């Protein structure tokens, strides 16, 4: 489902993905609050279109202002335990990982998915980018279904 919202002009690129973090204290009193704060906190979104002929509006959060874009909830790539990795299955993430230097860290601790949430696997992507898991986990890279924002 496409939603029209306002985001920072520096972020307004078709295809860009972001996780909506919610309201900033600087949003208080802004006349555009209802257009900016209309997404679901913690949900990953993809910009699918940029509204043409829309003006750039001043913003206390974004230094270059905000502009109107169309967004849709986006799938979340993530590593899950291999024994649970099948399309259509409901799984949770394997758990926290302190190894931030690992090429898979962004998939083991993905933006837009929480450890205590069960998510539906949309598709199995295959091997994760790391050679060996430092926590000795047998992992598979999957894509979680986009959540309805």
From Swiss-Prot:
It comes from the Archaea. Coiled coil: none annotated. InterPro entries: UPF0179. HAMAP family: UPF0179. Belongs to the UPF0179 family. This is UPF0179 protein Hlac_2319.
